[in-house]
């Protein structure tokens, strides 16, 4: 009767485990990347919805007074969080975001901004208003595009 494993059996078992582990690492990386992409989509959507709600409220005259050069858009992202005075109300504010979401690719709350007057592909912000946001990450998507174009 034989006890234990031979060297060949141990090498074969170790090789199988190593092969399975080598296949699992790329799958785990892919899942982490996919999760970050999903979080980026959600964060961008949340901010863009808040920007649109601010613009709608400004167009309806629900908030004010507004600066003329802002064209009805928020001057900063922080204004969406801190709130804007409601028109006709003494101490009431209209808040559009609870907090500025964290960019999952850069792990910061610092987003790239574009104003209404900026070129759509511009990476420098004119500062007049916040018309759109994008990630400041220089990483590329799986299909070769830029996350900053989302």
Residue ranges and their predicted role:
Residues 6:
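Active-site-proximal cofactor/substrate-binding loop regions of enzyme domains
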Residues 9, 27, 79:
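Ca2+-coordinating acidic residues in Ca2+-binding motifs
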């Amino acid at each position: 009767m034989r006890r234990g494993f031979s060297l060949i059996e141990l090498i074969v078992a170790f090789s199988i485990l190593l092969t399975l582990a080598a296949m699992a690492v790329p799958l785990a990386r892919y899942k982490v990347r996919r999760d970050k992409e999903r979080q980026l989509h959600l964060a961008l959507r949340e901010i863009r919805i808040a920007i649109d709600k601010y613009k709608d409220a400004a167009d309806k005259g629900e908030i004010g007074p507004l600066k003329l050069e802002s064209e009805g858009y928020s001057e900063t992202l922080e204004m969406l969080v801190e709130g804007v005075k409601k028109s006709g109300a003494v101490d009431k504010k209209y808040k559009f975001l609870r907090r500025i979401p964290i960019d999952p690719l850069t792990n910061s709350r610092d987003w790239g901004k574009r104003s209404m007057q900026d070129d759509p592909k511009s990476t420098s912000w004119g500062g007049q208003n916040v018309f759109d946001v994008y990630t400041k990450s220089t990483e590329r998507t799986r299909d070769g595009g830029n996350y900053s174009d989302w």
